[in-house]
A protein has these predicted regions:
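Intrinsically disordered, low-complexity Pro/Gly/Ser/Thr-rich segments with frequent PxxP/GP/PP motifs
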Residues: 34-62
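Local sequence-structure signature of Cys/Sec-based thiol-disulfide redox active-site neighborhoods
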Residues: 95-130
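Short, conserved sequence motifs used for protein processing/export or organelle targeting and
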Residues: 76, 131-363
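Asparagine-centered strand-capping/turn motif at beta-strand->loop junctions
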Residues: 13-18, 212
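Short, solvent-exposed loop/linker segments at the N-terminal edge
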Residues: 1-7, 197-201, 411-415
Length: 452
């Protein structure tokens, strides 16, 4: 893709796959109407050697029409001409749109090396032109249609990382892969996304506008993934295996979230497995895939050629009870985003993408127990109590102060499933009524006590 009008250099690399030295060769290219030839002489290309060339004739792009380009070599001594020709299409654009990359991470709670991918995505959160998606395997967060097909673009073991389904590597290299892809010229952009959660229907509605900056030939589609942060459950199937903890094979490798992500939790000091609440829950989790098709929604963009202009699409509503892991963690719309991608359905390449936080309508009253203000409606519809009277009955808050320097708030009292401690502390010991220590933990805002 190039900005119209412009002249394009025809460049390439010649590789000598034969035994004989190549001293001269003809390089030709055609736009379907005219053919241009360079007779290259004085060469010294040995067996398996290479030579980089730039053709003396440039391709002139002076419209938004697609330019078919064929480049080939002619060498009389070549016994195998099957690998001498390359064909591509060069399209003119009216401008260069901003590029956003998508980093997909293959992960699973069963995978002891997978904290590496979680930390890598956490490190990329400060990069606004990067969108991270965690694609889970073999655990309650798995979306079969996503998990079954992501290996086509990110082959190999776990964890695995890839950007735009073009580059794939260790997820620790997300930053490098992003830097490579974000400078690529693409012919399209996601202009806007509207994502609304309706609590009266428990459905998520997403609409988008995409824009193509030229007349682009191909099969392109729009795709939407709902992602959510801070997913945690006391169910043991949500515990994360961890090879980076004390005595683990990876303990010598620093595996710590940035300070502003998950409170800087370090897997290096955590046991295995790690309860999800200990590290603040799973982030960037793919919870739904539109049309259950990794290549996007068929018919969401014109087929054959997508002409210059804007295109609107409304995705099929998502029922929240169909979200991956819903039975364990439900859905918190305040921590969810809609990711819209423009995908080449032939190659799988993600050309561009956008992300937006969900908004809401028809939110019902609910209440949380605030240690200072008592029962408060958070306005999210997902407070811990659906009735104010129930909240008032349970909201018996204890406050502990020491020397006017340290202050802690603990609630609810009595505690049932989770104990919330508001305040700064290093560690906590919990004792039963007989004075026996039943739990020792490092700093956590929320402590699971279901098993006590």
């Amino acid at each position: 893709y190039v900005v119209n009008p412009t002249n394009v250099d025809i460049k390439g690399t010649i590789t000598n796959g034969g035994l004989n030295l190549i001293t001269s060769i003809d390089v030709k290219w055609s736009d379907g109407t005219n053919t241009y030839t360079d007779n290259l002489t004085g060469l010294n290309i040995i067996m398996n050697g290479t030579y980089n060339f730039t053709h003396s004739a440039q391709l002139i792009v002076n419209s938004l029409a697609a330019n078919s380009l064929t480049v080939w070599l002619e060498y009389a001594a070549d016994l195998d001409t099957s690998n001498n020709t390359l064909t591509t299409t060069i399209a003119g654009l009216t401008s260069i749109p901003a590029k956003t990359t998508v980093g997909e991470e293959k992960t699973g709670t069963w995978c002891g090396w997978c904290p590496r991918g979680a930390v890598a995505l956490g490190e990329m959160e400060s990069t606004s032109s990067f969108i991270g998606i965690a694609v889970h395997n073999g655990d309650p967060m798995t979306i079969s249609a996503y998990d079954d097909n992501i290996g086509t673009y990110i082959p190999g073991g776990y964890p695995g990382g890839g950007v735009d389904r073009v580059l794939e590597d260790n997820p620790a290299y997300f930053s490098t892969m992003h830097a490579t892809r974000v400078t690529d010229i693409v012919p399209c952009i996601v202009n806007s996304i509207t994502a609304v959660y309706d609590q009266s229907t428990n459905k998520i509605s997403v609409a988008t506008e995409a824009e193509f900056i030229g007349n682009i030939i191909g099969d392109f589609r729009l795709s939407c993934v709902i992602v959510e942060d801070d997913l945690q459950s006391s169910n043991s199937s949500w515990d994360q295996e961890n090879y980076y903890g004390p005595g683990g094979s990876g303990n010598s490798t620093n595996m710590t979230f940035p300070a502003n992500v998950n409170n800087g939790f370090s897997f290096n000091t955590a046991a295995s497995p790690v309860p999800s609440a200990s590290f603040g829950g799973y982030d960037h989790v793919a919870r739904s895939l539109s049309n259950n098709d990794i290549l996007g929604d068929a018919g969401s963009l014109p087929s054959g050629t997508v002409n210059l202009g804007t295109y609107n699409h409304i995705f099929t509503d998502v029922s929240t009870n169909s979200l991956a892991g819903y039975n364990d963690v439900g859905f918190n719309w305040t921590k969810a985003h809609a990711v819209v991608m423009i995908i080449n359905a032939v190659t799988g390449e993600i050309l561009n993408a956008g992300k937006t936080a969900l908004t809401s309508i028809n939110i019902v009253d609910s209440w949380d127990c605030d240690p200072v203000n008592g029962c408060v409606d958070p306005g999210t519809g997902i407070g811990n109590y659906s009735a104010l009277a129930t909240c008032n009955a349970a909201c018996n808050t204890n406050s502990i102060e020491e020397s006017n320097t340290l202050s802690f708030n603990l609630y609810p009292n009595p505690v049932k499933d989770r104990l919330v401690i508001e305040g700064q502390y290093t560690s906590a010991n919990i004792y039963d009524v007989f004075g026996k220590a039943v739990l020792t933990t490092d700093y956590q805002n929320t402590i699971e006590v279901t098993a006590l």
